[in-house]
């Protein structure tokens, strides 16, 4: 069963990270803007704030891990798929209490909703490999 408040946090985090991709707004300003413009009443706001801030703070490490498994340059990725991958890799690295299957399932749902038609297949392939690497022994 899907945790709706956590799902909504990821959904808004994806949108915030997508926006950050284009304008690199500071995390606090980005979060404040989302808090003002969206009804987050059915959202795990603390989780939203953490994953947005954490993903942006750790983007260099996240991108380095991801790049080793890409079949193209990171700059050639669809911005939605890139944002979903960054968010999911952050969760795999820093939210170990969240099962890797949940991270992947949520990522696929987000890509199906916001991304290119076959984007979920690409995201699944990358996260499948990375989840094994990151969560070894977990």
Swiss-Prot record:
Coiled coil: none annotated. The keyword RNA-binding applies. One of its GO terms (biological process) is DNA-templated transcription termination. GO terms for cellular component: cytosol. Keywords: RNA-binding, Transcription, Transcription antitermination, Transcription regulation. It comes from the Bacteria. One of its GO terms (molecular function) is RNA binding. InterPro entries: NusB-like_sf, NusB_fam, NusB_RsmB_TIM44. Involved in transcription antitermination. Required for transcription of ribosomal RNA (rRNA) genes. Binds specifically to the boxA antiterminator sequence of the ribosomal RNA (rrn) operons. Belongs to the NusB family. PANTHER family: ANTITERMINATION NUSB DOMAIN-CONTAINING PROTEIN, N UTILIZATION SUBSTANCE PROTEIN B-RELATED. This is Transcription antitermination protein NusB. It comes from Coxiella burnetii (strain RSA 493 / Nine Mile phase I). The lineage of its organism: Bacteria, Pseudomonadati, Pseudomonadota, Gammaproteobacteria, Legionellales.
């Amino acid at each position: 069963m899907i945790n709706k408040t956590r799902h909504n946090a990821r959904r808004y985090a994806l949108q915030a990270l997508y926006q950050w991709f284009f304008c690199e707004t500071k995390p606090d300003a980005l979060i404040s803007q989302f808090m003002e413009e969206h009804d987050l009443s059915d959202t795990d706001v603390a989780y939203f704030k953490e994953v947005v801030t954490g993903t942006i703070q750790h983007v260099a490490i996240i991108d380095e891990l991801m790049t080793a498994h890409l079949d193209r340059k990171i700059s050639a990725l669809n911005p939605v798929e890139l944002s979903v991958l960054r968010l999911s890799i952050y969760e795999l690295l820093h939210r170990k209490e969240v099962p890797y299957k949940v991270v992947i399932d949520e990522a696929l749902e987000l890509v199906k909703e916001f991304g290119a038609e076959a984007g979920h297949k690409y995201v699944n392939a990358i996260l499948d490999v990375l989840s094994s690497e990151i969560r070894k022994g977990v």
